[in-house]
Amino acid sequence: MHFLSPAKLNLFLQILGRREDDFHEIVTRYQAIAFGDQLSLSISSRDSLQVINACHLETPSNSIWKSVALFRRYTGITTPVSWRVVKQIPVGAGLAGGSSNAATALFALNQIFKTGLSDEEMRSLAEQIGMDTPFFFSTGAALGVARGEKIIALEESVSDRYVLYFSSEGVLTSRAFAVVQPSDCSSRKNLEYTQNDLEKPVFRLRLDLKEKKHWLESLWAELPVHIGLTGSGATLFVRYPEILEEDPSYAAQIQRAVTLSGGLLTSPIRRDPTAWYSIYSESALAAT
């Protein structure tokens, strides 16, 4: 069985302060995108994991094995399984690659063993894995509150396009939050729905990302776009309304900017509650 394990963007992320448990209270807008890893699952004689493009992730601590352990504990099914992941999402990119793999693995196990777990049951298991893992059991658009793990599904669809800019070096989420200062946080009464409060602390750690954002701002200056950091980085992204592409003049400028900057153009993706995210056909995935 083959599945898309999609990346996500934080279209905004605001920090409301530090909680009593020493985590930070946040509100964020998650959006799944039509870019991600390819995950395959089969029943086997022994447990195994192969990760193409990132063999260093073939370890017992991989988030996929966390999903397997939770699923087995919850269902009592212990049949060995074999995983193959074609890794496209960079590590430490702010795109939730590990969380997406974990969520996709839970869904895949539910499918292959026909256990009939509801989204709510899988979301509850996902909360034990990572803060943004439960998001993937939404329709692909949601608010994340508390530490980001409490999901409020959004039904409206967005007609945006995104251009992604990766970094050769990732940013640890824990490190980014560790350097957050009170002045970086937002007021509950003054939320800005394009702002990422982690930008300032991350840019203090990574001057190269700050400079890269300034370069992108100059490159895209003639277009009505938003440029920001997703999560704790290190991925920067450009966001613009898809309708711009219907104007030949804007379309040409967009194409030029994407080409000159070497960005990856992608779109939002939604999930049918009865299925999983998909931008590939089953036959196309099987051929990889």
UniProtKB/Swiss-Prot annotation:
Binding locations of ATP: 90-100
Disulfide bonds: none
GO BP terms, alphabetized: isopentenyl diphosphate biosynthetic process, methylerythritol 4-phosphate pathway; terpenoid biosynthetic process
A molecular-function term among this protein's GO annotations: 4-(cytidine 5'-diphospho)-2-C-methyl-D-erythritol kinase activity
Database matches in Pfam families: GHMP_kinases_N (PF00288)
This protein's UniProt keywords: ATP-binding, Isoprene biosynthesis, Kinase, Nucleotide-binding, Transferase
Keyword Nucleotidyltransferase: no
Record's keyword annotation contains Disulfide bond: no
InterPro entries noted in UniProt: GHMP_kinase_C_sf, GHMP_kinase_N_dom, IspE, Ribosomal_Su5_D2-typ_SF, Ribsml_uS5_D2-typ_fold_subgr
Domain of life per record: Bacteria
Reaction(s) the record says it catalyses: 4-CDP-2-C-methyl-D-erythritol + ATP = 4-CDP-2-C-methyl-D-erythritol 2-phosphate + ADP + H(+)
Listed pathway(s): Isoprenoid biosynthesis; isopentenyl diphosphate biosynthesis via DXP pathway; isopentenyl diphosphate from 1-deoxy-D-xylulose 5-phosphate: step 3/6
EC number: 2.7.1.148
Active site per database record: 8, 132
Family as reported in the entry's similarity comment: Belongs to the GHMP kinase family. IspE subfamily.
Cited function: Catalyzes the phosphorylation of the position 2 hydroxy group of 4-diphosphocytidyl-2C-methyl-D-erythritol.
HAMAP family named in the record: IspE
Protein name as catalogued: 4-diphosphocytidyl-2-C-methyl-D-erythritol kinase
Originating species: Chlamydia trachomatis serovar L2 (strain ATCC VR-902B / DSM 19102 / 434/Bu)
Gene: ispE
